[in-house]
Amino acid sequence: MLGKKKIPIVFEDDSLLVCEKPAGMPVQSDTSGNVDVETYLKHYLFEKQEGDGEPYLTAVHRLDRPVGGLMVFAKTKEAAAKLSRQIQNHEFEKCYQAVVCGALPEEFGTFEDMLLRDGKTNTTKVVPA
């Protein structure tokens, strides 16, 4: 069911799980039928546990399908609530890096583009600002 793709787990304790999401993999299940990070991790936790029942696991933030990087998951409702508050209070820092082709006009700066979402296909693409 989960295929051969491995998702590296960077940190795990009783409350949190941090993994390295591969680029091209959705965080949650969608209509594509592809394996998603959340299902993979729930399977991993189910295999580790000593009881029956589905383990609690929820993503506390999102990364788009084309993006790879670290993902934080809460393993308890209490951890999910605390992390949600931290995000709302801007105490949760995210840092993005990008690979670009060609030469940039400046070494440093802010480069902005708009995202166009297609609700029918559940896809998003960059359009020039």
Where do the PLM segments sit?
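RNA pseudouridine synthases
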Residues: M1-A129
